A protein has these predicted regions:
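A membrane-interface helix-boundary motif in multi-pass transporters
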Residues: 140-164
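Helix-to-loop junctions at the C-terminal end of transmembrane segments
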Residues: 43-60, 146-147
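Intracellular juxtamembrane helix-capping segments at the cytosolic ends
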Residues: 100-115, 125
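A late C-terminal transmembrane helix in Major Facilitator Superfamily
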Residues: 113, 117-147
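Conserved extracellular-gate-facing transmembrane-helix segments in secondary transporters
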Residues: 3-12, 103
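Short amphipathic helix-loop junctions that connect adjacent transmembrane helices
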Residues: 4, 13-30
Length: 190
């Protein structure tokens, strides 16, 4: 999950730049971010809880990683299409749905990795590591990458940057390493 955050964070740092460069007004951004994004986020949380309950931790985390990776493709599509209110609504909606779903499932995963006696401290360290790794590795490179390759290729690159995390999680699942690291938390429905 920590490896996966690089692509996601790289993309998230640049959405506002894309919107500005495509000529969206603050009012347009607010309408779609709040009007569509908020509801898509809530639906993602709800669906994440349902799928987690039915599929268990491992498969629901895998789906979260895939959704969060491919959500960046919607911004590549928006960049290619140009100023499109429908495109903006779709991109923000899909991104927020994936974030809501992923947020629920990843919180459950991080929590399951923690020892019950030290849950707060361990969870804080895992969460901070995920955030810092993504921001330190990507914060200084996003703008220069966009200038050199353009938005479409940039968002395609962020999708590719997330794939090693997805593939590593699949590898760990197949080897039983995810189940082993989770202990009893991941065994009931893997």
């Amino acid at each position: 999950v920590l490896v996966h955050k690089v692509g996601d964070t790289l993309a998230n740092l640049t959405f506002r730049l894309l919107f500005d460069d495509l000529g969206y007004t603050n009012d347009e951004i607010a309408v779609y971010d709040v009007g569509v994004g908020f509801w898509a986020f809530l639906i993602g949380i709800f669906v994440g809880g349902l799928i987690f309950g039915r599929w268990g931790l491992q498969r629901s985390v895998l789906l979260a990683l895939v959704l969060m990776a491919i959500s960046n493709l919607s911004f590549a599509g928006l960049a290619a299409a140009g100023h499109s209110n429908l495109g903006l609504a779709a991109a923000i909606g899909f991104e927020n749905f994936a974030s809501g779903y992923g947020g629920v499932v990843v919180v459950a995963y991080f929590s399951a990795l923690c020892n019950l006696r030290f849950t707060a401290a361990q969870y804080a360290l895992i969460s901070a590591a995920a955030s810092v790794i993504g921001r330190v590795l990507t914060g200084t490179t996003a703008g220069s990458l966009i200038e050199s390759i353009g938005y479409v290729d940039f968002y395609l690159l962020t999708t590719l940057a997330a794939l090693p995390g997805v593939l590593l999680f699949v590898f760990m699942m197949r080897r039983g390493l995810v189940e082993e690291s989770l202990g009893s938390a991941g065994r009931n429905r893997s």
